[in-house]
Amino acid sequence: MHIIFHPEDEMKKFINVYIKSDYDIVILRLSVIIIFMLFGTYKWFDFEVMALKPLISPTWLNILYIMFGVHGGSYFLGIVETITFLALSIGFFRPAAGILGDIIVIVTGLVTLSLLPQLGKVDSFVIKDVLLLGAGSVLLKYDLKNYLNIKN
C-alpha cells in the first residue's frame, strides 16, 4: 500500500486551520507585549533617559520633566509601559485586562504621534506608533468581542 503525499492538500489544511484559529491575534499581542516590555524596561536606564531628553524637552510632553525631573519622567513612562505589557499579557486570559492594555497602546500611539509637529522631524521613535495604533485597534476589537461574549 502506497500513501501518496499531496502538498496542496496539506497546504489547504494548514490554511483552513489558520483561518479558524486566533494565531494572528496571539502573534500580534505577543509582538506588542515585547515592544512595550523592551521600551518599558529601557526607561529605567540612563541610555534611554538621555535618548528621550531631546525628543521630549521641546514638546508638550516636557510637562513630565517639570513634574518629575528628567529621570522621573522616564520612570513614569516606564511604569505606564510596564502596566501596558502586563495588562496585555493578562489579556490572554482576562479580556477586561486586555481592553485596558489595548486602550493604553492606542493612547500611547496618539500621544507619541502628537509630538510630530513640535519635533519637526520623523524618526523611528515616533513612527513605530503608527503601527501601534493599528495593532491596538485590532486587539481592542478582539478583546471587546471576547469580553462581551463572556458576559452574555
Named regions from a protein language model:
Residues 2-83, 87-152:
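Membrane-interface extramembranous regions
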